[in-house]
Structure formats: structure tokens, C-alpha cells
Amino acid sequence: MIPAYLSNPFAAVFGGGKPIDGGRTYKDGRRILGDGKTYRGLFSGIFCGFLAGCVEVWLSFRGFEILGIEMPGFGPDYTSSLIVVLALASGALFGDMFKSFFKRRMGLKRGASLPLVDQLDFVVGAWVFTYLAAPEWFVSNFTPGIMLTVIIITPLLHLTTNIIGYFIGVKKEPW
């Protein structure tokens, strides 16, 4: 999950510039995504998440351990692993964009809180993209127990990192 976890904060850190929706509105008269979703954020977030995943892949293929725990594998070979890592990183940001689209439809402005949805949107996106890219790997690695653990831990991690981002001036809201 590290590629998914890191793509969002790096999108916020390096984002800005031209919005993905180009300022266009949907048929309801509201912005499609809003100013918070930019090409620079999308590409830099995917790149940074992918890069973190590449480091994980490299370490796992070398048998690296932390406190006696092996690094997770992302596939039987480098190519398969890189596909999974890219799916996790890109899926996270597309999940976040999907959520933004629906928040705009609900009339919620950029930065408005939508509890649990704000914390788990990128997880769902990462899982969907990863399942589509590598279904066998996904099913064998994201067991119900692992998925439940991710669903429980992610909101706490998300809130913590957002508060840090708020205090260092990267985010406008602490959620």
C-alpha cells in the first residue's frame, strides 16, 4: 500500500498549475473536479508513489527485512511488480479524483470534509486499479484480514498526515 499511501501527499506537495478539468463545469453547473486536481499533482503523485514502490520492489527482491519482517513482494518478477506498483500509485489518485467528482455533485466545495470517504477513496481506487491490472496477485495478497486492517488503519494514518500537511502549510484544511 506504500505506493498508494504516498501518491496523495506528494500530489499535494508538488501539485498546482492547470486543473485537470480545465475550469469546465458539469451539466449541473458545478466544476467537474475543481482547482485541487491538477496535472502536475496527478503526474508527480503517480511518479513519487511509483518510485517508492520501485524501492520496495528492489528491496523485496533482495530479501530485505525490517525487524525480522520480510518486505512484501509485488509479483513473481520485476515487470509484474512494476505493473502492480503503478496500479497502486495511479489508482489512488484516480480514486481521489472520483471522490472529488461526486463531492462537487453533492455541492461540497474543495476541502469540505466527507468523513471516511475522504480517508478511503484512494484505497478503493488503488484496489480497483490493482485488481484490474493483476487480479491473481490482488486476490492472493489482499485477503479479507489485510483489507480490514487497511480499512481500520488508513483513516488514522490519513488524518495524521493531513494534520502534519496543514501545519507545514501544504494543505489548507487539516482533513
From Swiss-Prot:
Entry EC no(s): 2.7.7.67
One GO term of the biological process aspect = glycerophospholipid biosynthetic process
> Has keyword Nuclease?
no
Write out the catalysed reaction: 2,3-bis-O-(geranylgeranyl)-sn-glycerol 1-phosphate + CTP + H(+) = CDP-2,3-bis-O-(geranylgeranyl)-sn-glycerol + diphosphate
UniProt keyword Zinc-finger, yes or no: no
Domain of life the protein comes from: Archaea
As for subcellular location, the record says: Cell membrane
Topology of the protein relative to the lipid bilayer: Multi-pass membrane protein
Q: What's this chain's function? A: Catalyzes the formation of CDP-2,3-bis-(O-geranylgeranyl)-sn-glycerol (CDP-archaeol) from 2,3-bis-(O-geranylgeranyl)-sn-glycerol 1-phosphate (DGGGP) and CTP. This reaction is the third ether-bond-formation step in the biosynthesis of archaeal membrane lipids.
What is the protein name stated in its UniProt record? Answer: CDP-archaeol synthase
Organism, scientific name: Methanosarcina mazei (strain ATCC BAA-159 / DSM 3647 / Goe1 / Go1 / JCM 11833 / OCM 88) (Methanosarcina frisia)
Q: What is the lineage of its organism?
A: Archaea, Methanobacteriati, Methanobacteriota, Stenosarchaea group, Methanomicrobia
